[in-house]
């Protein structure tokens, strides 16, 4: 027993020394910021619970607006000027919340979140639920947890009057999970805010590496699409491969797709044919991602269509892929003809030197707070997000929100302690950037 007490005493002493070392790396004001965050850890989770219990699926505009009103009240209390940005009614989207304050001190910051979730009103997951040491709920980590981190980081700074004379804009979009169309309209407010800012921080959830360490995102691949249309000569199947009948549309489509696989691939570039239809008669509606086909085994296919996505990290990479794909499509088999068209959706967030400097500043804040270094997540491990629309204009850092698992599934959850950790890191980073 005495040995156990001695071991506990040594451990307590070591922890105290580590805490003292971390505190020594922070200024007196920064130590007060950390204390202010910790003081509200319980209240932050309570606020998060209230927002999670309001359904805000993208296609539930009133629910999105209600969650927006909850966050708007918090920003109003912190002295921000707030407004709701409506979108055209035909888009059937709720709109966006914007909160801003203007000053002349330090960098002008843009903080990005979103109010909507993938959990619509008919989802079986509707409420906050404790599961052991985890919390389960719709949007608890993607991304109402990130939104709460933004509010609580700013609240800690406001307590010390550290927001005075700073320029900070917060944009919470209401349709991140399923954006309205056209994107030029739905993301106009976000782009406008970026053009008035120096740096942007996105609070999507943190992704852990293979060793279980927190990372941050300095690059995200673009999301774009392609449509392949092939025509062949309809004829009796006995003549397939002949000079007069040719190979048909399905063989040509298969040749093209396989050539894409063999000749176009490179690191950080992916292209996935998500749907394909072929036969004598085909129809495909890209608006609803559905198609149909009619054909007989004794008739050479006259039509083939395939739709896919293309994800790339830089525009140079996109252009190389487009050129290779067009060259493959142009080399048609006898009796067939093909064409390919491309469409753009989310622009790339390339891993620029400015993004890397932001990561270094964020990692240093984390180290100084005793929370460990933060490494960059490989871009191929994240999907598309709102931060990509501002990446062409400012240096960006994303993925600095909460830690959770099962995003976009009925098992989406949150590690509760990650809210406090991420809030401390964010508050210190914002404080240092705005001095």
Regions found by a protein language model. Give the residues of each.
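Bacterial N-terminal signal peptides that target proteins for export
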Residues: 1-11
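Extracytoplasmic/secreted envelope proteins and their assembly/folding machinery
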Residues: 45-49, 68, 72, 151-154, ...
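Acidic/His- and Gly-rich active-site-bordering loop/insert found
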Residues: 26-138, 158-165
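Acidic/histidine-rich catalytic neighborhood of metal-dependent amide-processing enzymes
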Residues: 143-219, 281-288, 434
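Short, flexible, mixed-charge acidic loops at enzyme active sites
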Residues: 120-130, 219-222, 286-291
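Alpha-helical metal-binding/catalytic segments enriched in His/Glu/Asp
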Residues: 111, 131-181, 224-230, 239-263, ...
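Bacterial N-terminal signal peptides
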Residues: 11-21
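Metal-dependent amide/peptide-bond hydrolase catalytic core
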Residues: 26-32, 46, 56-57, 208-210, ...
């Amino acid at each position: 027993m005495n040995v156990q007490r001695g071991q506990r005493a040594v451990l307590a002493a070591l922890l105290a020394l580590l805490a003292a070392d971390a505190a020594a790396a922070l200024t007196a004001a920064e130590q007060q910021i950390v204390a202010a965050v910790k003081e509200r850890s319980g209240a932050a989770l309570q606020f998060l619970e209230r927002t999670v219990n309001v359904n805000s699926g993208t296609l539930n505009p009133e629910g999105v607006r209600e969650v927006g009103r909850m966050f708007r009240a918090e920003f109003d209390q912190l002295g921000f000027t707030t407004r709701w940005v409506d979108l055209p009614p035909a888009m059937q989207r709720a709109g966006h919340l914007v909160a801003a304050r203007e000053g002349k001190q330090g960098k002008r910051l843009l903080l990005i979140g979103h109010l909507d979730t993938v959990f619509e009103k008919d989802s079986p997951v509707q409420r906050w639920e404790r599961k052991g040491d985890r919390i389960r709920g719709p949007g608890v980590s993607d991304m109402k947890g990130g939104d709460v981190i933004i509010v609580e980081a700013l609240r800690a700074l406001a307590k010390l009057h550290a927001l005075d004379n700073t320029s900070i804009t917060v944009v919470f979009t209401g349709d991140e999970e399923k954006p309205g169309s056209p994107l030029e309209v739905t993301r106009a407010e976000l782009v406008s805010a970026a053009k008035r800012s120096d740096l942007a921080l996105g609070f999507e959830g943190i992704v852990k590496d293979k060793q279980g360490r927190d990372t941050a995102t300095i690059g995200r691949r673009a999301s774009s699409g392609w449509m392949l249309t092939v025509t062949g000569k309809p004829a009796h199947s006995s003549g397939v491969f002949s000079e007069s009948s040719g190979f048909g549309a399905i063989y040509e489509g298969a040749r093209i797709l396989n050539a894409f696989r063999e000749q176009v691939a490179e690191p950080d570039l992916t292209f996935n044919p998500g749907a394909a239809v072929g036969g004598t008669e085909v129809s495909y509606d890209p608006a609803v991602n559905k198609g149909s086909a009619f054909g007989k085994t004794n008739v050479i296919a006259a039509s083939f269509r395939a739709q896919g996505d293309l994800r790339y990290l830089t525009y140079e990479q996109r252009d190389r892929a487009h050129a290779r794909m067009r060259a493959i499509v142009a080399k048609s088999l006898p009796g067939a003809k093909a064409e390919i068209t491309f469409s753009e959706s989310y622009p790339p967030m390339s891993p620029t030197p400015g993004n890397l400097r932001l990561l270094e500043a964020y990692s240093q804040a984390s180290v100084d707070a005793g929370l460990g270094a933060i490494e960059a997540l490989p871009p191929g491990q994240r999907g598309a997000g709102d931060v990509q629309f501002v990446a062409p204009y400012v240096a960006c850092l994303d993925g600095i929100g909460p830690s959770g698992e099962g995003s976009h599934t009925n098992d989406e959850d949150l590690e509760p302690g990650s809210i406090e950790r991420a809030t401390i890191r964010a508050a210190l980073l914002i404080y240092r950037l705005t001095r």
